Amino acid sequence: MRVDTRKCKGRMMQDLNEIFETIKSVAKEISEVIKYADLGYTTHENATGDTQLKLDVQSDEIITAKFKALSCVKALVSEEKDEILPINTNGKFIIAYDPLDGSSLVDVNFAVGSIFGIYENELKPQNLIAAAYSIYGPRLELVINDKKGTKPKFYRLGKDGNFKFVRELELAQKGKLNATGATQKGWSKTHRNFINELFDEGYRLRYSGAMVSDLHQILLKGGGLFSYPATSDHPNGKLRLLFEVLPFAFIYENAGGTTSDGKSDTLFDVNITKTHQTSPCFFGSASEIALLHKFYGKD
């Protein structure tokens, strides 16, 4: 029996569009909740030991409820859930997400966001087929990358309550911004020398403490470097591969950028052995990652 591949591809795009529409709905709801939510802490910790904010849990519950309604979703994996949550045995896609990245900054009114990775059938780097993130700031913004090899698409919420396409995002070969994370006293000498070189070349420091907003700024401004290295207290980095790192690696590489853990040619080469695994990570234009490899001894 011959399979109609056009029908299969059409069904996949239909399912993905349903997922993206759900992400749009989620973004609008979380954006409203943030305005008036209780910003206190719960008595619980997530799988990586972070004490959960009530807003983290509320955002996670919103996303879970929305995606449970989709027959194409096989399972959900969240930064705020210890285990994978099965949804539909006949579903095809696993959604891995950070419900509210930078949530501890809401009390000082910084921009925060949600990150989504869409995996086909299995949670493997090569199975990540689409990614998206939303930004909750002065404006509600959304970036969707629906296919490998295509540029990420940037949207902004309009007065009519609908997201309006603004433009495709593309990184220049060399940028001007340097968003460097982790506590400096824990940096290696190699990393310190690398960052100092960027400043010596005239890069401007732009770091808020929310991964999603810092990476968003670099994308919109055309280039630069975001780094969260291995440190003495977090030798495997602190950012989570499935929920945060790989979705942004997908978007950055499709925007013409490059990613690395300091050793690899791409973050997609990192071997994942557990759901909440973390990794050092570097996202940037080609020039910044080439300089990274020079300092880290890859070349």
Curated annotation (Swiss-Prot):
This is Fructose-1,6-bisphosphatase class 1. Mg(2+) 1 binds at residues 79, 98, 100. Its cofactor is Mg(2+). The gene is fbp. Pathway: Carbohydrate biosynthesis; gluconeogenesis. Homotetramer. One of its GO terms (cellular component) is cytosol. Its EC number is 3.1.3.11.
